[in-house]
UniProtKB/Swiss-Prot annotation:
Mn(2+) binds at D36, H218, H220. This is 4-hydroxy-2-oxovalerate aldolase 1. The active site is at H39 (proton acceptor). Its EC number is 4.1.3.39. Gene3D superfamilies: 1.10.8.60, Aldolase class I. It comes from Parafrankia sp. (strain EAN1pec). Belongs to the 4-hydroxy-2-oxovalerate aldolase family. It comes from the Bacteria. The record marks R35 as: Transition state stabilizer.
Length: 377
């Protein structure tokens, strides 16, 4: 028998009798509490709160921390909601607080500009997601290219992914890849995807994307599937995972970070996060900030059921209060019309149409939804 000297390697035994080594995912966990979570507090985080959350997340081992107005860089506006601070103040708070996690931000072409991207980079942002509606990847080319020129990690973020069939979504992902994206996400902005829907979209991605291009999942919990959909995504090739403390995010929130990490531990996946630290920050810091519970309830469940952009929730609730409607009726009509992110201003139009449609019996309802509200005249 020939002996092997130290340092000499051999090819792995691939004989049929030897079971294959199980694949263990090594996840890139990105926290979105300080960006998507802005929606849950009407974009009102204080700078000190941002600093506290970022410090705790960094200590708990997440790979990246996303920070911006809920609608991305330059999102602060009457249409989307005025932020308590500028993006730059929040970003400076985060970049000054982290030593290991990658400071990240989000940019929606048409809201944020290349100038905004450059300013974010100057303040320490090193990764960016360029977000478009799921059928409009072509408008991301300039911003993805600019991010690459700055030496940033850049991902494409295809929002409302339930509105495009798997093959079409994959075609859009291929466009983002061609512009230079290192990663492309399935972004379930409406919390509408089921586990089968998630599986089919990631399989479609794998059919067309270069193996070197990463894929990621951004789930919302409107149907109660945030963790389950994220698990299915990882099982079908996703390496980047979005989640937030206590699920803090638009609608019923995002995939709850601490719950997902617990599941990932049970499944033996690598993630680098410290579970108890995440639990403590979720319960002691984040939950007390909520002026409206982030949970699956009749309004947020309607978001997922009707396939409505999750950040429409607070806008629809305000319109319902103003015009004496059931929030669910507004959301169901918004879903029927296929409204997408950026059309927040049209929610009032929907409410006025529903008021005009009200019958003489004092019942305000969307004929399509079958949901009624009592007469509040």
């Amino acid at each position: 028998m020939t002996s092997l000297s130290a340092g000499t390697s051999t090819a792995p035994d691939t004989s049929p009798d030897r079971p294959a080594e199980p694949f263990v995912p090594d996840l890139y966990v990105q926290d979105v509490t300080l960006r998507d979570g802005m929606h849950a507090v009407r974009h009102r985080y204080s700078v000190e709160t941002a600093r506290t959350i970022a410090t705790a997340l960094d200590a708990s081992g997440v790979r990246a921390i996303e920070v911006a107005h809920g609608d991305g860089l330059a999102g602060s506006s009457i249409n989307y909601g005025i932020g308590a601070h500028t993006d730059w103040e929040w970003i400076e708070a985060v970049t000054a607080s982290v030593t290991n996690a990658i400071p990240t931000s989000l940019l929606l072409p048409g809201i944020g500009t290349v100038r905004d991207l450059r300013q974010a980079h100057a303040l320490g942002i090193r990764s960016v997601r360029v977000a478009t509606h799921c059928t409009e990847a072509d408008i991301s080319a300039q911003h993805i290219s600019a991010a690459r020129d700055l030496g940033m990690d850049v991902a494409g973020f295809l929002m409302m992914s339930h509105m495009a069939a798997p093959a079409e979504l994959a075609r859009q992902a291929r466009l983002m890849e061609s512009y230079g994206a290192h990663c492309v996400y399935v972004t379930d902005s409406g919390g509408r995807l089921t586990m089968d829907d998630v599986r089919d979209r990631f399989r479609a991605y794998s059919d067309v994307l270069d193996p070197a291009t990463e894929t990621g999942i951004h789930a919302h919990h409107n149907l109660g599937l945030g963790v389950a959909n994220t698990v299915v995504a990882v099982e079908n090739g996703a390496t980047r995972v979005d989640a937030s403390l206590a699920g803090q995010g638009a609608g019923a929130g995002n995939c709850p970070l601490e719950a997902f990490i617990a599941v990932a531990d049970l499944m033996g996946w690598k993630h680098g996060c410290e579970l108890f630290g995440l639990m403590d920050t979720a319960d002691d810091v984040v939950r007390p900030l909520q002026d409206r519970p982030v949970r699956v309830d009749r309004e947020t469940l309607t978001l997922g059921y009707a396939g409505v952009y999750s950040s429409f929730l607070r806008h629809a609730e305000a319109a319902a209060t103003r015009y004496g409607l059931d929030t669910r009726t507004i959301l169901a009509e918004v879903g029927r019309r296929g409204m997408v992110g950026g059309q927040e201003d049209m929610i009032v139009d929907v409410a006025l149409d529903l008021v005009a449609r009200a019958t003489g019996r004092g019942i305000v309802a969307s004929a399509e939804s079958g949901i009624t509200a009592p007469d509040q005249s």
